[in-house]
Amino acid sequence: MASQGTKRSYEQMETGGERQNATEIRASVGRMVGGIGRFYVQMCTELKLNDHEGRLIQNSITIERMVLSAFDERRNKYLEEHPSAGKDPKKTGGPIYRRRDGKWMRELILHDKEEIRRIWRQANNGEDATAGLTHMMIWHSNLNDTTYQRTRALVRTGMDPRMCSLMQGSTLPRRSGAAGAAVKGVGTMVMELIRMIKRGINDRNFWRGENGRRTRIAYERMCNILKGKFQTAAQRAMMDQVREGRNPGNAEIEDLIFLARSALILRGSVAHKSCLPACVYGLAVASGYDFEKEGYSLVGIDPFKLLQNSQIFSLIRPKENPAHKSQLVWMACHSAAFEDLRVSNFIRGTKVIPRGQLATRGVQIASNENMETIDSSTLELRSRYWAIRTRSGGNTSQQRASAGQISVQPTFSVQRNLPFERATIMAAFTGNTEGRTSDMRTEIIRMMENARSEDVSFQGRGVFELSDEKATNPIVPSFDMSNEGSYFFGDNAEEFDS
C-alpha cells in the first residue's frame, strides 16, 4: 500500500497508541494481554473456580462476556431507562460450569457490573483499558466467523450467500473502534452501509435534523473505512461516489453490491490477528509470565508459542468429535475462518476440514441443554509451523474454487495462488455498466477479467519452524491446487442469529 507511512499499524490501533517503534508496540500489546490475564486470574478467585474449571473455554467466554457487558455504556444506559421485567440493569452474569462428583454442573451466576469494572481496572493499572475489551470482542467475533455462516444476513441485504469470505467481523459490535474496523471484511462494511441506506429509504427523518447530521457523519466515516480497504483506484473512486451521494438510495446500494462482488477477485485489505480466550492469557500470568516485559505481538509467533503450551478444555456434547471442536477453536484463535484450508492445513500440521464435515456445534452450551450427558476434553491448539498474519488481501490469481464459498480471504502471509471461481463471479456482472459509475465499473470488470492464474500472492513468504522466532528461514509450501480450499464449501453450518 502506497500510504504505508501515514498508517498506524493495527497493533497501534489495538492499543490506542500513537506511532511507536516495534519495541514499544510489543510492550503495549503485552500490557494489554497481560491485563486480560490478570483480570481472568482475579475473576477465577472471585468465583472460586479451581484450576481445571478456570481452563474451561466456556467459563472463559462467560467471564469475557460479563466484563464486555459491564463496560457496554450504551446498553447499560438503555437498560436503566427501559427497565424490563426480571432484568437487573446493574448486574451481569452467565453460566459457570463446575466439576462435581465426576459430572459437570451448570450454575447461573450474577455479579454487580460495578464490581466487575473495579476488578478489570485494578488488573489494568487503574485504567479502562478499552484496547483489552476490544481484543476480547475480536476473539468472540473470530469464533462466530468460524462457527456460523451468515447466509441469511447476506440474502437480507441483497448480497449473494457465496460471498461469505467477505464477512469477517460481521458480529463485531459497533463500539469496537479502529482495531475492530481493521478486521472487518469488505462484505461486513457493505452490509452495515446497506442497512443504513435502507433505514434512510424507509424513514424520511433518518438523514434530517441534528440526529441526521450525526448519522451522515457516521455514514461517511464508514464509507472511508471501506474505501481504505480497497487496493485499486477504480474501487476507491466508486466509494467516493457512494460517500458523496446527496441522498443515499438504491443507486448506492447497487454500487456497494457491485463493489462487494468485485472484492471476490480484487481483494480488500483486511487485518488478521490472533486473539486468544482470556483463560489462555490467565494461565500464562498465573505461571509468572510477564507479558509487558517480554513483549507480545498478535501477528507474529507469540500466539503460536502461547498455544503450544496451554492446556485448555472444552465441554463436549454426546455426538460431537473433540478433534473437530479443537479445529473450530484453533481456526478462531488465528482468525482463519476464510483462509484457504490448504494453508491452514500445512501450518497446523493436522488435517483441517470444511465446516460442513465437522461433527461439532458452537462452543457455547445453551441453558436448556442437558448437562447430564456432557463431558469435557482437551482442546488441541498446537501447530506444526507458524506464519505471519496478513493485513492485505494479496494479489489475485485464477484458480478452481468451490460451490459454497467462491473465494478466500488470506489470513497468513504465505506464498500461494489465491483460488476463486471466475466464471461464477463474472456471471454476476452481466450487462449493468451504465449510470454514473459506468467508467469505474468497466475498469473494475476489466481488471477482474485480467486477473491471471500465474500470479502468485505473497511472493517468497512462507511458514516458519516454531524454533525460528526471528522468521529467518521461510519454508514455502507447495499446495495441491486440484483440491478444494474453502471452509464453507457447499455448506450447512448453522446460521448466526443476532
Curated annotation (Swiss-Prot):
InterPro entries: Flu_NP. Encapsidates the negative strand viral RNA, protecting it from nucleases. The encapsidated genomic RNA is termed the ribonucleoprotein (RNP) and serves as template for transcription and replication. The RNP needs to be localized in the host nucleus to start an infectious cycle, but is too large to diffuse through the nuclear pore complex. NP comprises at least 2 nuclear localization signals that are responsible for the active RNP import into the nucleus through cellular importin alpha/beta pathway. Its main location: virion. GO terms for cellular component: helical viral capsid; host cell; host cell nucleus; ribonucleoprotein complex; viral nucleocapsid. Late in virus-infected cells, may be cleaved from a 56-kDa protein to a 53-kDa protein by a cellular caspase. This cleavage might be a marker for the onset of apoptosis in infected cells or have a specific function in virus host interaction. It holds the Pfam family Flu_NP. It comes from Influenza A virus (strain A/Equine/London/1416/1973 H7N7). A motif (Bipartite nuclear localization signal) lies at residues 198-216. A motif (Unconventional nuclear localization signal) lies at residues 1-18. HAMAP family: INFV_NCAP. GO terms for molecular function: RNA binding; structural molecule activity. Homomultimerizes to form the nucleocapsid. May bind host exportin-1/XPO1. Binds to viral genomic RNA. Protein-RNA contacts are mediated by a combination of electrostatic interactions between positively charged residues and the phosphate backbone and planar interactions between aromatic side chains and bases. Belongs to the influenza viruses nucleoprotein family. It is found in: Virion; Host nucleus. It comes from the Viruses. Residues 1-21 are annotated as: Disordered. This is Nucleoprotein. Keywords: Capsid protein, Helical capsid protein, Host nucleus, Host-virus interaction, Ribonucleoprotein, RNA-binding, Viral nucleoprotein, Viral penetration into host nucleus, Virion, Virus entry into host cell. One of its GO terms (biological process) is viral penetration into host nucleus.
